[in-house]
């Protein structure tokens, strides 16, 4: 049977050779039938201490490595780039100012 693989974002890298990965999934509410985001955190083994906070990683199920670690980092899909986030925030702010300048919202 193949091992489970999940994709998530590193939320903590403070431990040696261990990262905490948050994995989001959509679950349908049993009564209201609306899809709701659910987040679960997994402790994963990072042998070379390569992962940093904000990285998107793929983790794979493995044998128990400690009391809480049952996953290992397979690969880093995308590195976190703070410059890209700042650029996106600036673009959004410019769009808001452009809309407000055209009389969209009056203060």
Curated annotation (Swiss-Prot):
<keyword id="KW-0689">Ribosomal protein</keyword>
<dbReference type="InterPro" id="IPR012340">
    <property type="entry name" value="NA-bd_OB-fold"/>
</dbReference>
<comment type="similarity">
    <text>Belongs to the universal ribosomal protein uS17 family.</text>
</comment>
<comment type="subunit">
    <text>Part of the 30S ribosomal subunit.</text>
</comment>
<dbReference type="InterPro" id="IPR000266">
    <property type="entry name" value="Ribosomal_uS17"/>
</dbReference>
<keyword id="KW-0687">Ribonucleoprotein</keyword>
<protein>
    <recommendedName>
        <fullName>Small ribosomal subunit protein uS17</fullName>
    </recommendedName>
</protein>
<dbReference type="InterPro" id="IPR019984">
    <property type="entry name" value="Ribosomal_uS17_bact/chlr"/>
</dbReference>
<keyword id="KW-0694">RNA-binding</keyword>
<dbReference type="GO" id="GO:0022627">
    <property type="term" value="C:cytosolic small ribosomal subunit"/>
</dbReference>
<dbReference type="GO" id="GO:0003735">
    <property type="term" value="F:structural constituent of ribosome"/>
</dbReference>
<dbReference type="GO" id="GO:0019843">
    <property type="term" value="F:rRNA binding"/>
</dbReference>
<dbReference type="InterPro" id="IPR019979">
    <property type="entry name" value="Ribosomal_uS17_CS"/>
</dbReference>
<dbReference type="GO" id="GO:0006412">
    <property type="term" value="P:translation"/>
</dbReference>
<keyword id="KW-0699">rRNA-binding</keyword>
<comment type="function">
    <text>One of the primary rRNA binding proteins, it binds specifically to the 5'-end of 16S ribosomal RNA.</text>
</comment>
<dbReference type="Pfam" id="PF00366">
    <property type="entry name" value="Ribosomal_S17"/>
</dbReference>
């Amino acid at each position: 049977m193949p091992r489970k693989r999940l994709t998530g974002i590193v939320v903590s890298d403070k431990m040696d050779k261990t990262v905490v990965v948050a994995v989001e999934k959509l679950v349908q509410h049993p009564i209201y039938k609306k899809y709701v985001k659910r987040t679960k955190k997994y402790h994963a083994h990072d042998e070379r201490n390569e992962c940093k906070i904000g990285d998107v990683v793929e983790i794979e199920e493995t044998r128990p490595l400690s009391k809480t670690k049952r996953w290992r980092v397979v690969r880093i899909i995308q590195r976190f780039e703070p410059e890209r986030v700042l650029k996106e925030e600036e673009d959004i702010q410019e769009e808001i100012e452009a809309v407000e300048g055209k009389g969209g919202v009056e203060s």
